[in-house]
């Protein structure tokens, strides 16, 4: 059985949060840079390219910018990066 990832998702992306939870991932709402720690991957809106410092080296995983992507696109990117 595959171990699901811990995914940080910006709080305005509620549809993405729900979709990732349905896939079995642990979803953490990103309210501050500390919330991103321990996440395998983070999903941000892209409205602020360095949202709360998350786009820098504060996390070990990838940062996915949701701008222009559908919820399905984002979920596929999460699957390919975790």
Swiss-Prot record:
Signal peptide: none annotated. InterPro entries: UPF0180. It comes from the Bacteria. Belongs to the UPF0180 family. This is UPF0180 protein BALH_1248.
